[in-house]
Structures are given as C-alpha cells and as structure tokens.
C-alpha cells in the first residue's frame, strides 16, 4: 500500500464536534504528558455505545471515524480535564484517542487524518511534543497503546506496523505545524485542556 503524503483534500470536521459524555471517567491525578492512540474493538457507533456503557469500565477522550469522503466524524466522550479509562496505569498521564478500525488497515485513511489533526491540536494546546515516544514511562509525546506494554494493559493496538505509524506521526507533525484544529472544538469544559 502506498500512503499519501497529505490528505487528498482538506479534512473537514462537523461543526461543532459531537459530544456524548461517557460515565466512565474520573478525576485526573496529574498533568497529562502523553497522547495515546488506540484502535476500537468495533465500528464507530457500537464502539461509542460500549464506551458510554458503565459495564464497559472503559472510555476515551475522542473516537474518530473516516468515511472516505473528506468529511470525517469525531465524537468526544470525556472532557479534556478528566481522566478517560483507556490504558490502565497511564490513564491520568494521557489523552486517549480511538481511531477507526479501517484507518489502520489502509482501507479508509480519513480517520487517520482526522486523528492527526486532533493530535496536532492537543500538542499545540498542551506543549506535549508532536513526536513518537517509545519510552512513555519517562518521555512526553505521542505513543501507541502497544508501546505501553504490560503497564498499559498489554495491547497491540492501534498497529504494530512501524512504517504505517511513522507515516501517521508525519501527519501529526504536519498538522501541528499548521496550528492544529482550533476554533470550533467544543464549548465549556470540553474545550479546556488540562
């Protein structure tokens, strides 16, 4: 698969970003220094339903879905200033994004471009460097759930393909340099980034 250097056309998100607050959240105990990228277990709608179900005991700050149209969908489930339950002992230290399953298979890159823009936005607002950290216990940056190892629950998402991950990180840096996604992202406590 040949990965594009940039989106074929600008990524446009709905205005405003969709919000559906998950009960699966709690107070943060520290300032986040990581962005952790995940791959949901299922498709967009059912994944949102599951992450908003108290029985799941899991959540994320944002979940994205690509539709291959250039207009992609993102829903925020947990306010930025709260802890999402997504990666075990790293929950307080991180912002967590679930990126549509098809993005990591190369079937629909829209969700990956949207997630890159979100990561660029978070990096701009928080000072987290737009760089892949493979030492998430000690270095700030962006990491895969997989990179957290056993301390993050022992997962292999969103991808173990280093070539694809490096491509994704180039998109994050590109969005960071453009200023990230800013004005239309949320109101009230959803807009505040801890």
What are these regions (language model features)?
Residues 1-17, 23-29, 103-194:
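Basic/polar, cationic surfaces and motifs that engage anionic cell-wall
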Residues 61, 76, 96, 114-118:
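Generic beta-strand or strand-like secondary-structure segments
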Residues 91-101:
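Glycine-rich, often proline-containing surface loops adjacent to acidic residues and nearby aromatics
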Residues 37, 95-97, 142-144:
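Hydrophobic faces of well-ordered beta-strands that scaffold small-molecule active sites
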Residues 1-91, 152-161, 189-193:
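N-terminal catalytic cores of peptidoglycan-degrading enzymes
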């Amino acid at each position: 698969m040949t990965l594009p250097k940039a989106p074929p056309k600008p990524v446009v998100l709905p205005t405003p970003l969709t919000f559906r607050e998950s009960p699966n959240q709690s107070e943060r105990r520290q300032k986040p220094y990581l962005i952790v990228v995940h791959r949901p277990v299922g498709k967009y709608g059912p994944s949102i339903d599951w992450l908003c179900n108290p029985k799941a005991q899991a959540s994320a700050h944002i979940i994205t879905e690509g539709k291959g149209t250039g207009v992609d969908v993102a829903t925020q489930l947990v306010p930025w200033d709260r802890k999402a339950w997504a990666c075990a002992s790293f929950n307080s230290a991180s912002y967590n994004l679930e990126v549509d399953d098809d993005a990591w298979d190369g079937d629909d890159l829209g969700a990956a471009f949207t997630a890159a823009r979100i990561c660029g936005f978070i990096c701009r607002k928080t000072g987290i460097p737009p760089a892949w950290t493979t030492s998430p216990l000690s270095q700030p940056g962006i990491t895969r759930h997989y990179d957290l190892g056993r301390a993050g629950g022992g997962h292999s998402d969103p991808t173990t393909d280093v070539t694809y991950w490096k491509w994704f990180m180039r998109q994050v840096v590109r969005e960071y340099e453009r200023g990230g996604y800013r004005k239309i992202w949320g109101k009230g406590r959803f807009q505040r980034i801890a």
